[in-house]
Amino acid sequence: MNSLKFKLTFYTLFGLIWSLLVFFFLSPWYEETLKKDIFELKQYKFSNFLILYDKIEYNKFDYVDGAETYFRDAFGFETKTLEGIMTSIKVLSTLAFLSTTFLIYFTIIFYVHIKFIFDTENHRRLGKKVWCYVLIGSPLVSFFLSFITLFLIIGIPSAVRNDCYKEYGKKFCNSQLRYHTSFIGENQVWLWGPSRGWIILMVDTILTFFATIYCWRNAHKFDEVKMKKKKKNYLNNNNNKNNIL
């Protein structure tokens, strides 16, 4: 019963973690938006920039009828620092996703009785050790990767500002209200801060942290029934061989 309870909890937790990472990839991570109340026309939302997994959208109008219009394709200066951070975010978040996928896939294989290295004399002990490492190591890796990614996204405003400094200097950039210094905030004209992708990743990171602790405390339960069966079969086979001899 303990093993079954652990399996259900395990697959529920990591199924949710996996799904949250998928939604993170599909959602915008950070945005800077012009306040609506300074416009007479209310039929659209204006985003100065919107950062997603595969692109950065600049000056985008979302109309009620679904039409989209872009009238600028860059910040007006090179964004090498921002692009470097974006690349790091993509790599780390993808590795976190692959780590979670690997864990789910590997445990499924384990439970459909596909044999790897367990056909040895010490298969029970070796198998349990391997799976304890997998069950603790994979979520721990995913947690650290997601945690680092969270802080990389926090660095997006600083990256934009630093790129502006390189092109125009601090005096000009500091006079531009858009090139703000905080991760989240607003002024007379702009609202800026994390979008729903960052919030999803934060929830995913917290959930992965607790899932890691759960696996660490209960990893032995995941294979206890299977290993008991393996040990029983192994002993029976040895007894049969001895009887034949």
Curated annotation (Swiss-Prot):
Matching InterPro entries: DDB_G0287341-like
Localization of this protein: Membrane
Superkingdom: Eukaryota
Membrane topology value: Multi-pass membrane protein
Residue spans crossing the bilayer: 10-30, 94-114, 134-154, 196-216
Gene Ontology CC terms, in alphabetical order: membrane
Protein name: Uncharacterized transmembrane protein DDB_G0287341
Organism listed in the record: Dictyostelium discoideum (Social amoeba)
